[in-house]
Amino acid sequence: MLNNSRLCIIWLFGLISGFNLMITGNTLNYWLAKEDIALQTIGILSFITLPYSINFLLAPIFDAVQIKYLNKIFGHRLSWICLTSSALIFLIYIFSFLDPSTNLLLFAFTALIISFFSAAQDTILSALRTEIVPKESLGFTSGIYIFGYRVGMLLAGSGAIYLSIYLTFNEIYKIFAGLVFIYLILLIVGIKYCDLNENIHIQIIKNDIKNNQNKKNIINFIYNALKPIGSVYFIILILIFLVLYRLPDNLINVMINPFLLHLEYDAFEIASVGKFCGVVGAIIGGLVGGVIMKHKNILNSIFLFGIIHALGHILFIFLEINGKNSLLLFITIGIASITGGMTMTAYIAFISALCQGKFRATQYSFLSSMMGISRSIFPIISGYMVVNFGWQNFFLFTTIITIPSLLILLKIKTKLQ
């Protein structure tokens, strides 16, 4: 049974991950849309979050390599957290002086580097979370983690857009740099207070990597790390499912800011209804999903939540047909966010449940990287889809594309039984 202090730490992990993601994700996307950057370009720039797709390549390093001096002071995981946080603080502050309308290439490159360190930190936090949470508590703690994740998104998303009424985005990103510093202090204090004993576990992993001659390169290491999960065919099925299940949301997320600006909503309406209510709904959905999964197994939950969430996407079509309508926007965002929070909770719990053995960090990072591929690579075409087929067909596609992922899930369920 987890005590309250550890639950708070798990919540803080989620908050930091959600906050960091928004810095180079939706908030950056809104900044670009406000600068009237072309839809096709905005879609292409979703690649900025690409490091989240390949962070599993870094997981073996975080598992095995110690930062000599910091490790003595903070311990293995926390020393890596300190290093990545320091890099983020510096880079975000530098980024706050750039302008996408005058030098888009430098702007995008710097954002990509920030995304790299954000993804690296996300990998470390996820590994630490899987180490301190018993398997039987994964469903409930996933809800706590997603709660924190959504609060982080709220701060860096809705909060930033609301502040853009009064401040420039350059000023807002300076504030972001300061908040990342505060989060680092909270993490150091929280982890030290909880006295998380990770060093024995890490030393076992380090020795195993060093002594096992089959793990001479990264590919062999990942292959051996994934063996406890199942056969190659089974893992491929899981990877395809993980990409497709999150694809509808990720396509919409890249285009939601241009869509709301297209309907002529202002910054306050987008921040309050489009973002704040959306994040609150996602938090509620995450908590509801966590509670449901305490009484219903993860596979059945993720299937049910996926169907409900897909139907919610149809409301965006009605919003496009009706035009600017605050009540309909509230209903659409509310339903999409609550059901989205439920699916995300089940999704994280599903990945966590698959991880087993000594190399959970590598397993979790590799599997969760599929969420990154779904978020970074495929949405590149979203702008072209809207320009060539229109908003209504775009949202119809996001509803239909859910079906293949659910069919694959049924196949996975059969394999597990």
From Swiss-Prot:
SUPFAM superfamilies xrefs: MFS general substrate transporter
Gene Ontology molecular functions: transmembrane transporter activity
Keyword Membrane belongs to the record: yes
Keywords carried by this UniProt record: Cell inner membrane, Cell membrane, Membrane, Transmembrane, Transmembrane helix, Transport
Localization in the cell: Cell inner membrane
Membrane topology (UniProt): Multi-pass membrane protein
Record Pfam families: MFS_1
Broad class of where this protein is predominantly found: membrane
TM ranges: 7-27, 42-62, 78-98, 104-124, 143-163, 171-191, 225-245, 273-293, 301-321, 328-348, 366-386, 389-409
A single Gene Ontology CC term: plasma membrane
Family: Belongs to the major facilitator superfamily.
Protein's UniProt name: Putative transporter AmpG 1
Organism: Rickettsia conorii (strain ATCC VR-613 / Malish 7)
